[in-house]
Amino acid sequence: MSSRRKRAPPMKVDEERQQQLHWNMHEDLRSEPLTMTVGEQACSDADSSSDCIIIDEGPPESALHRDKKRRSETVSVLEATEEETRLSVTLNVTVSPYRVDNSWKAFLGDFALQLLPKESLVEHFSERTFTLSPSESSSQFLIYVHSECKNVEKQENVLEGSAGVCSKGIRVESSFSSDMLQDLAWLQKRRGIKLYQRPDGTHTIKVGIYILEAGLTRLDFMSDAGSRMKKFNQLMKRVMEKLHNFIIPDVLEEEEEGSESEPEGQDIDELYHFVKQTHQQETRSVQVDVQHPALIPVLRPYQREAVNWMLQQEQFRSAPPADNSLHFLWREIVTPDGLKLYYNPYTGCIIRDFPHAGPQLLGGILADEMGLGKTVEVLALILTHTRQDVKQDALTLPEGKVVNYFIPTHCPREKVKNREIQDTEYEPKEKVHCPPTRVMILTAVKEMNGKKGVSILSIYKYVSSIFRYDVQRNRGLLKRMLKCLIFEGLVKQIKGHGFSGTFTLGKNYKEDVFDKTKKQAVGSPRKIEKELRKSVNKDADSEYLPSNTSDDDEPYYYYCKAGKSRSKLKKPALLTKKGKGQSVHLDSQGDAPAAGVCASTDVHVSENTCVSEDKQTQEAKDCAESPNPAAEELAQSNTSSPCETSDYRFECICGEFDQIGHKPRVQCLKCHLWQHAKCVNYEEKNLKVKPFYCPHCLVAMEPVSTRATLIISPSSICHQWVDEINRHVRSSSLRVLVYQGVKKHGFLQPHFLAEQDIVIITYDVLRSELNYVNIPHSNSEDGRRLRNQKRYMAIPSPLVAVEWWRICLDEAQMVECPTVKAAEMAQRLSGINRWCISGTPVQRGLEDLFGLVVFLGIEPYCVKHWWIRLLYHPYCKKNPQHLYSFIAKIMWRSAKKDVIDQIQIPPQTEEMHWLHFSPVERHFYHRQHEVCCQDAIVKLRKISDWALKLSSLDRRTVSSILYPLLRLRQACCHPQAVRGEFLPLQKSTMTMEELLTSLQKKCGTECEEAHRQLVCALNGLAGIHIIKGEYALAAELYREVLRSSEEHKGKLKTDSLQRLHATHNLMELLGAKHPGIPPTLRDGRLEEEAKQLREHYMSKCNTEVAEAQQALQPVQQSIRELQRKIHSNSPWWLNVIHRAMEFSVDEELVQRVRNEISSNYKQQTDKLSMSEKFRDCRGLQFLLTTQMEELHKFQKLVREAVKKLEKPPSREVIESATVCHLRPARLPLNCCVFCKADELFTEYESKLFFNTVKGQTAIFEEMIEDEEGLVDDRVPTTTRGLWAVSETERSMKAILSFARSHRFDVEYVDEGSVSMDLFEAWKKEYKLLHEYWMTLRNRVSAVDELAMATERLRVRHPKEPKPNPPVHHIIEPHEVEQNRIKLVNDKAVATSQLQKKLGQLLYLTNLEKSQDKTSGGINPEPCPICARQLGKQWAVLTCGHCFCNECTSIIIEQYSVGSHRSSIKCAICRQTTSHKEVSYVFTSEKANQEDDIPVKGSHSTKVEAVVRTLMKIQLRDPGAKALVFSTWQDVLDIISKALTDNNMEFTQISRIKTFQENLSAFKYDPHINILLLPLHTGSNGLTIIEATHVLLVEPILNPAHELQAIGRVHRIGQTKPTIVHRFLIKATIEERMQAMLKTAERSHTSSSGKHSEASVLTVAGLADLFTKENEELE
């Protein structure tokens, strides 16, 4: 059941609401509404305004006939299709006379009903309602006139067959067809329109069609597609087409949004060519000289054209258009009655309000090809077109307002800055002035007074923290003053004796304070000060008297009660000094301090009731005009502090508390919240110039206008923008800020951002800023929905508080998906001009442009519905004109080929490096290919249509079916790059020798697995033969098992339990002396072998038991030593609790324990926390006593239970464990000694640890309900969970911490420390004790496993009950033959697999020998057929025998066998090997090596080729720089280690933090000539013209990424020829991929260059990649 509670009892719905909640399931199929019951009346009162048209079921008939007809029509409606429904359902329309009422309606048009000859109308026809029904003739209709009725509402709901309807119909002809009338009826039923009579001639009846207010559409915005049901809009479109001749030009019928299919081959170049032609033909409205004086480079002609077009897009030097144009989607219609309505012909929506056109596009897409200088074009635009109409309203201080700013007065102003920076540094203890001790004690007692009073420790703490009084030094003084106050009756003791009790205010407190307050109110300032000085001197206390000139002056604090009003005085009233005289301003109500207003402090002060308002004003003026600086400073320092007012609220973004620190504070002008000025980046010099608003108020206000341009770029090229600006723009021309987010800068004031010319931000920062948008204000309702008040204010993003002049998305293809966080945040920014800058705006397809259009905010195409319907859907239907024309308006594109004569870039060439695998790599690749091919085909078969492109599938499916391809591509680079195959790369890079060793180990493991399967099948077959009485055959199979294990003894490990099974059962067969079993020499040693196998198996368990016991003893010894250190009779924590109660600090202790338990505590829903079980020290004492007793109890029980299990297990223990949990019938019974001990462990664990995981009992209780039986017959090893600190231990720690902080007896603290050490020792003991229990349990389990290992297959006895659940070794008599056939098949498969794997192992072993460098890679063994030396090339069959390549080719060509002649037989052992399983060894690969350039280290073929190529580049052209691109970072790490081995200096870009540093080192350091770049981050936007070589380690499926990578060097500024190097492995998936990409490029050059792998590949193409390569391998 849901945990949500009902908020209110159920209530009965009124009748009107009930009618609204009724509906008909088939109403969309029918043309008439539901008929009403016959019992309803026909008419009543005449003043209704309900619907004026109803639909009846037909002419008047008898009730019986009508009921039968209704039932038959209902059946026909249910069975009819949508087309049949329109023809079969009877049309009935009721038209009412027109009456003026208060409801809104508009006349759309009318249709005519023409009377036939010999037909006439009844009297007063125009005032009566009639029903229009069809007649026998399809072109004629019948009118049934209703009787007169006073109530229009009842008249309109009149029913067929009622007495109020005429029985004779009047024949008419309609100007509307029957279909159109049905549409009107459906619309009327939905309360969208009404039909009324209109006056006309006697032979013609005019019926007016009126649209009602309910028929109008409510839109959220003008481009909204509408939320009304689709059928309503379709019918309205038909009506408007009929009445107003609205026909949608050049737009196809709307279809489902997902129905369009992507066109075959999107020609992106065709779009770019159209854009280019359009711009060449248009005339420029703006032609200016864009060569700004501050711009250093001279713009090329194509760049000038681009900047001029951008200026035109931003309406440079042109007046903005009037904002009164009609929206593109809407048409204005004037109804016959003169009303103006607006109609959307695309949706059928009608509205009343004028649909204003959306804001005109300012900006666009700058899509110049990579390397043509888009950055310079943007800088020229920024310099040329600056904002002129910047509104400074939000940046200027409102007239009559001041910014409240103050520095806490207890901090000297000259030390504020130092303390802001170094609050924690040691400083000399400054002199602190405090009020009299009398005042401090009374304040403490009053403020902290509770039900039980205030203890003296609480008074000490309050005085120390609030007044900064040295309590340690003056404790005796405070005690003496407290005695005096008790004697005077100002304080009384309500509990305890002496100073250990609690205190509260006495009965004389009010009268005393009232008298003093009265005297002060009427006295002069000097007299008051004099009295206060006397009062101070009377106390035996440190005197408090402020100096006249010091900045350290503290104001006098005095507490007063005005009259008998019990108003709380939470803050002390303030005595301030002004000029030469002193004046006291005391608030008579005691609510807040009052003081004169000083203009120099800019602080609001409460109204003063003791001094007149005029006097305050005059004093403030005197203070402001005072010529003496010292007096001004004195007045400022002594003005009432804002923190002493009742409405003072402090909440800063730094998280510091109000009382901490001495930083200056500033108040928001809007929400009046105080914050640290430095934290919100507000400077004191701006007090009289700029207003201050807190971050939340700034974000909620109108954005601040600015001239700044916001540039959003990838992290990799953020610093490149700064470099480009510094290089291309003259110094001091632009102010540039690199914004790194609120995490780095805090909240920057919008006026600071507005002062910049360019603000640069990365997409990563923009993405993170989304988390700081829409944060609720601390003052709002959403901001206070927390149990405790927030410690700090969440910082909103200042980016949304600025109206940017220009927003530029660099490499805008990163936000083409409008759902990504960066795109979502970019859309939230407010800007005038919006620009998308990208050299490849289209990567997957033309649908990518939609994300850019959404950012630009171009209506209506920024709505997905209109983008698809008006642009993309026609494009898919071979009508690209609409899309091309729209894109041409917003995009500028220059291609390199069009401006090649202007940029003068040297040519770029390409080199292909075809490589061949080494034998070890080839073997590894074949293994991977076999697994990946099977995996891929299995996944692809789940997809029915193989013609689908991968881009049409969901992301998860694409990732799944591309995973096998990914593994093969990685295997071509380096075996260690394949995830999950080897250890992580952080350990070390694997050499080829290590790869060979790893492959040998894997192959050995596979051989052992195949051998285990073979032995299992042989043992099973032997059991079947014993069942059938074939004892000789059974004995032979058991002997075959023993022979096989001996035969492979040096190569493979045979399972000892399988050998024991064969030995034991063979010994039993021989002991039974069955006839026909021949003896062998080994029979006499079977018993001894069986004994050795058992002892060897048990020795491992016995060793584990001894080791666990040995590990446990030191911990138990340390526990005994710790227990000896605890001497007291009562527990130390109990003594601490008692002392806390004696000193009346028990409440503090309880609170500290609760806080300790609650911190980092995740409470379970069904469990009560310990902190909720006690309220005072008595409850805490009871809980701890109970829990410690339970802990010691279960600790003792667990130790005793384990002690009992130490002795060797008896037969009874083994049998009980077997029945209980080792081999239970269904569920574990938990009845043996081990299970009972485990339950004790579970209980002990719950006491010792804080464990939230279910124990064993709960787990098995849940498994009882499992119908399929026991899921796992093993007992869980432990309870399995979180070993966190228990609540008992945390309580003890809190008590110990309390005792230390209050300096209780050292004895208690020492015992507490020992107790905590004891807890740690107990936890160690528990873990070791549980491991010891596990080893003891495993020892019993091993004994049972030995017993189970000797059991063989047998038939269930006739009277033996059928086991439930079934047992594997007991079978039914009819299952014997089935098991025999299965085991025979298993034996054949295992034998074949074992031979294959042994052959591979032999092949790898021979390969290891052939790679011995001492032999030069030559195999000296002769070929078994021709006797020639095998040399450097030979073939290995699956059996492991080797032949020369010539003999192998002859065997394959002439002696192939099997189906399709696809196998050969070994010339030595005659074992069959398929052609594809023949392994070829090549110890000398000439294609991969160049003898003149040796490479150090053992690397993969491709890594070695990359390193050799880099070395060759350096030899041919010293100082030439090269970029190395790879899709995977792991491959780059492997290459980096290979470069290190060969002493080649390089740098690598793998982390954003070191990106700029490493890139600069590559560019400017002459010794670093190699840069390793990951493709996904290093290929976008970077300018690295210093490099001339680009190395692509693997073929790239996304050619757009490839173009980006190549474009890093082939761009403006490049002065040298560039070379692209590609590395491909022959006869692998890479060769197939390269051929596929070349084919796609030739068939459609441009479009294939912009697609991702998901767009390039189809399902069939992916399958073809695997199948074709499989054929090549064969």
From Swiss-Prot:
All residue ranges annotated as the Helicase C-terminal domain in the record: 1505-1663
Composition bias, Basic and acidic residues: 12-26, 526-541
Keyword Zinc-finger recorded: yes
Region span, Disordered: 1-26, 524-548
PTM-bearing positions, type Phosphoserine: 259, 261, 626
EC number: 2.3.2.27, 3.6.4.-
Biological-process GO terms, alphabetical: DNA damage response; DNA repair; nucleosome assembly; protein polyubiquitination
Domain Helicase ATP-binding: start-end pairs: 302-384, 701-859
Residues bound to ATP: 368-375
Keywords for the protein's UniProt record, in alphabetical order: ATP-binding, DNA damage, DNA repair, Helicase, Hydrolase, Metal-binding, Nucleotide-binding, Phosphoprotein, Transferase, Ubl conjugation pathway, Zinc, Zinc-finger
Listed pathway(s): Protein modification; protein ubiquitination
GO cellular component: nucleosome; nucleus
Zinc finger (RING-type): 1423-1470
GO molecular function: ATP binding; DNA binding; helicase activity; hydrolase activity; ubiquitin protein ligase binding; ubiquitin-protein transferase activity; zinc ion binding
H15 domain residues: 433-507
ZnF start-end (PHD-type): 649-700
Top-rank lineage group of the source organism: Eukaryota
Tissue spec: Broadly expressed (at protein level).
Known function: E3 ubiquitin-protein ligase involved in DNA repair. Upon genotoxic stress, accepts ubiquitin from the UBE2N-UBE2V2 E2 complex and transfers it to 'Lys-164' of PCNA which had been monoubiquitinated by UBE2A/B-RAD18, promoting the formation of non-canonical poly-ubiquitin chains linked through 'Lys-63'.
Complexes and interactors: Homodimer. Interacts with HLTF, PCNA, UBE2N and RAD18.
Family: Belongs to the SNF2/RAD54 helicase family.
Domain notes: The RING finger mediates E3 ubiquitin ligase activity.
Protein name: E3 ubiquitin-protein ligase SHPRH
